[in-house]
Regions:
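Oxidoreductase cofactor-interface core, primarily capturing Rossmann-like NAD(P)-dependent enzymes
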Residues: 2-58, 62-64, 76-78, 85, ...
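A hydrophobic C-terminal alpha-helical subdomain
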Residues: 3, 252-319
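Cofactor-binding loops of NAD(P)H-dependent oxidoreductases
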Residues: 72
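N-terminal Rossmann-like NAD(P) cofactor-binding module of classical short-chain dehydrogenase/reductase
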Residues: 84, 88-92, 116
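N-terminal glycine-rich "phosphate-gripper" loop used for MgATP/nucleotide binding
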Residues: 92-107, 280
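Conserved NAD(P)H cofactor-binding loop of Rossmann-fold oxidoreductase domains
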Residues: 94, 119-120
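Structural motif detector for alpha-helix initiation sites
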Residues: 199, 229, 251, 306-307
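SDR active-site lid
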Residues: 236-242, 248-251, 262-266
Length: 319
């Protein structure tokens, strides 16, 4: 595919903002696209923007009334090419490495001016491996070579993924086990830490990248502070007004539990590694988070929402 070049930043006009949302899945491309997208849609509408969503079947509901919803999948973009018509800015979420070139070609055909990619921290690990093994990094490279102004967003774990079940480190089975028997079973329970960001804050970062030009051709580390597993359990217990039992699983038991829930070994490997690393090197990783510039707070212009905030908004999922 030809590479297109643009030598100057192209300002975003107020045309259609196209968002993409896929069904929750448990594979290497997992991300809570619907949770983030619905928050983003509301924020863009409040800014006076026109919003269209290309959503897989089970993600077509729950959008604001004024959002145009087109049923289709960003993983099979050629089947829904009309969704790209008139799109000037695209929030690319849930794309697949094998078909992202097709999506980018449709964006060019539509004269899209900007694409904001919901990426992950996967590229930081993938770059040490042969290109044929890349997933996230393959998508990032394709976007960079598309000729469209781009921004990559590499977020912390999204708090809402615990409810949607799209990332094991978020406690993807906690709502079920807390409701069923009031217990959380987790590996590295005593010292596990993981960085989190509220989906409302992440959506605000995306909105800033979609509608302004301050972040063109940059990678935004949309990271929140590392939280301990026990502190998250305490937040849920306090909101419920009752104790939550805990079972500290050995790593191999944690792996077996996540396998039972349908997670592939690759996702489990990353999760176990990260939980242990953040616990062992908490001070260094916290400092790395604090050193990121621009910070999420710099971008959105307000303090970040906390895990307690998220729990208070979603406590019914645990009742």
């Amino acid at each position: 595919m030809d590479r297109f070049e643009q030598n100057e930043k192209t300002p975003v006009t107020e045309g259609i903002c196209l968002l993409t949302a896929v069904s929750p899945r448990r594979d290497e491309g997992t991300s809570p696209t619907g949770i983030i997208g619905r928050k983003l849609a509301r924020q863009l509408l409040a800014m006076g923007r026109q919003v269209r969503v290309m959503a897989e079947t089970d993600q077509c509901g729950g959008w604001p009334d004024t959002v145009e919803v087109v049923e289709g999948s960003i993983t099979r973009p050629l089947e829904c090419a009309r969704a790209f018509d008139g799109a000037e800015a695209v929030f690319l979420a849930g794309a697949h490495a094998s078909t992202v070139q097709d999506a980018l070609a449709l964006m060019r055909d539509a004269s899209a001016r900007r694409v904001v990619l919901l990426s992950s921290h996967g590229p930081e690990y993938e770059e040490a491996n042969p290109p044929e093994t890349w997933f996230w990094l393959a998508i990032e490279k394709a976007v960079e070579r598309s000729g469209i102004d781009w921004t990559h967003i590499r977020p912390s774990a999204v708090m809402g993924a615990a409810v949607e079940g799209t990332y094991p480190a978020t406690g993807s089975d906690w709502p079920d086990t807390v409701r069923a028997d009031g217990v959380v079973r987790e590996a590295f329970l005593g010292r596990g830490h993981y960085p989190f960001i509220h989906e409302e804050d992440l959506a605000a970062v995306v909105a800033a990248a979609l509608t302004g030009d301050d972040h063109t051709r940059t990678i935004i580390e949309a990271v929140g502070p590392p939280l301990s597993t026990r502190s998250r359990i305490r937040s849920i217990a306090a909101a419920l007004g009752r104790d939550i039992g805990t079972v500290d699983l050995a790593p191999d038991q944690g792996r077996a539990n996540w396998r039972r829930l349908g997670w592939p070994d690759g996702a489990i490997d990353v999760t176990l590694y990260a939980l242990e690393e953040y616990g062992t090197h908490y001070a260094e990783l916290l400092q790395w988070t604090l050193d990121q510039r621009p910070s999420v707070q710099d971008i959105i212009g307000r303090p970040l929402r906390t895990y307690d905030d998220w729990v208070s908004e979603n406590i019914d999922s645990f009742r």
